[in-house]
């Protein structure tokens, strides 16, 4: 499984891509492979505030329903609407087509506290 080096990772298997004062958030390849076939994704609305380490949505697979935990705090400025019609994108393209939300950061230092690709690989035994 590939773990992109340009992203940061949470212990709950979300990835974060920094774009200026905003971040894009999704779930990792490891997470989607553990969940199995994704059949539904529930995400917050644009304008919602999310708090680090708190649930902000959920992913339903044929195996289970898993909550999504916010790796950072901020305001949701965009939601990937394609996932409501094509939840399988999470399995097919977890790092590109299946981004979940874009968030305007309330504290940019939170990103630095997330795991590097190397640390995430160690945590998931993917090194």
Curated annotation (Swiss-Prot):
Domain Lipoyl-binding: 22-104
Pfam families linked to this entry: GCV_H (PF01597)
Modified residue annotations for N6-lipoyllysine: 63
Biological process (GO), any one: glycine decarboxylation via glycine cleavage system
Lineage top rank: taxon: Bacteria
Parts of the chain that traverse the membrane: none
Protein name: Glycine cleavage system H protein
Lineage: Bacteria, Bacillati, Bacillota, Bacilli, Bacillales
